Structures are given as C-alpha cells and as structure tokens.
From Swiss-Prot:
GO biological process, one term: box C/D sno(s)RNA 3'-end processing
Annotated S-adenosyl-L-methionine binding sites: 85-86, 104-105, 129-130, 149-152
PANTHER family membership: FIBRILLARIN (PTHR10335:SF17), RRNA 2-O-METHYLTRANSFERASE FIBRILLARIN (PTHR10335)
Family: Belongs to the methyltransferase superfamily. Fibrillarin family.
Entry keyword GTP-binding: no
Entry keywords, A to Z: Methyltransferase, RNA-binding, rRNA processing, Transferase, tRNA processing
GO MF entries: histone H2AQ104 methyltransferase activity; RNA binding; rRNA methyltransferase activity
Name this protein carries in UniProt: Fibrillarin-like rRNA/tRNA 2'-O-methyltransferase
Keyword Cell membrane: no
Alphabetical list of NCBIfam families matching this protein: PRK04266.1-2 (NF003276), PRK04266.1-3 (NF003277)
Length: 226
C-alpha cells in the first residue's frame, strides 16, 4: 500500500496492494473516526478513507471533478452540515488555519456533531435555517467557499441568498442538487438545466458533474461569484 498526493491540495490517493485506488484526507485529529470510515497509517501519518457512497463531495472528486476551491486555510460556510460526514473531510483539508461554519436545521442531527467538533475546533456548528441567512449573519464572516447539501425545492435560491450575504467576491459555491427534491414529475436532466439557469442568473457556472453511480439523480455544480 502507498499514499500519494492528489492534484487537489489536502486530498490524497491511497493505492491498495491490489492496485485499487481510493481517496483520503490526512486525519487532523489522529485516532478519531467520524462515520466508521477506514483509517490507515503510512509513513507516520494517519489517513481517513473518503467513502463516496456516504459523501457527495467525495463522489464528485472520484468522478473527475475539475474545480475544487476548498483548500488548506479556506473559510467555508457549509449549509446542511448534518452529522458531519463530509464536513470532517473538509475539516482535514482546511486544517487548523481554516474554518468551517456549519449550518443545520435539525437540533437532533446537530447533537450528533457535538462529539466531533469537541476535538475538531475548526468546525463551528450553528443551529439555523439555511433559507434565512439573516438568522446567523452575526455568527459567520465573509467566506471563500459555500458548500450546500440541502434537499429542498429552493436549493438554488438558498445558495444565491447565502452568497449575497457571506461569499467574498470571486469566491466559489458548490451545491449538490437532488432532482427529486425539486420536482419528482420531471426528468432529472430537465431539472438540472433549470437549476443551472437559476444559478447563472447570479453566478458564473464553472462546472456541472453527475454523481452517478454513487448518488442517483444527483449533480454537483461549482459556481463563482463575480
């Protein structure tokens, strides 16, 4: 087994003895597992295997994502942080110099995040409604990246509204879109085109990527604020 750097800073490729490749992040909190992920040690460092079936961002990277604006030192607003599966890998990437402000609507789900953030001090959990960014405006500074994973019909509008308040000029948004959450009566491709048009009303749309086979009827969009 060996580990090499991915072209995205903070992401690694683990090559198993059978030649299969997986992606991973270097564990910011050695010894901590967040979601039962496989942890390996290589040359004195600990790496957490990033499971693409549990993380839309992980799926996007494995599917050949070209634009990944989250880097070491980035400040990230994470909408729909849930119990922190993907956010824990983002935490590894941004490191102690970076910060994640994670908004979650469900108190029950946010409670599951508490044991993780006790050790991962670069994650700030916020109980809030992503459709109402004014509600957490006092808690979140201007950010480099907004990542959104909120399965709601208005998910494109949610990203735009939050970007107007929090995203730096030239900053990036990333949004995981589940077509069935927007309109179950339409074909996914039709829904994705409508979302792209809505996003393009405010952002420059940089990339769109299918998350199949890891997530059915999902796409990830990368956008840039002018």
């Amino acid at each position: 087994m060996k580990v090499k750097k991915h072209r995205f800073p903070g992401v690694y490729i683990v090559i198993d003895d059978d030649g299969s490749e997986k992606i991973a992040t270097k564990n910011l909190v050695p010894g901590q597992r967040v979601y039962g992920e496989r942890v390996i040690k290589f040359e004195g460092e600990e790496y957490r295997i990033w499971n693409p079936s549990r993380s839309k961002l992980g799926a996007a990277i494995l599917n050949g994502l070209k634009n990944f604006p989250i880097k070491p030192g980035s400040t990230v607003l994470y909408l729909g942080i849930a119990s922190g599966t993907t956010a824990s890998h983002v935490s590894d990437i941004v490191g102690w110099e970076g910060k994640i402000f994670g908004v979650e609507f469900s108190p029950r789900v946010l409670r599951e995040l508490v044991p993780i953030v006790e050790e991962r001090r670069n994650i700030v959990p916020i109980l809030g409604d992503a459709t109402k960014p004014e509600g957490y405006r006092a808690l979140v500074p201007k950010v480099d990246v907004i990542f959104e994973d909120v399965a709601q019909p208005t998910q494109a509008k949610i990203l735009i509204d939050n970007a107007k308040v929090f995203l730096k000029s030239g900053g990036y948004g990333m949004i995981s879109v589940k077509s069935r959450s927007i309109d179950v009566t339409k074909e996914p491709e039709e829904v994705f085109k409508e979302v792209e048009r809505e996003l393009a009303s405010y952002f420059e749309v940089v990339e769109r990527l299918s998350l199949e086979p890891y997530e059915k009827d999902h796409a990830l969009f990368v956008v840039r604020k002018p």
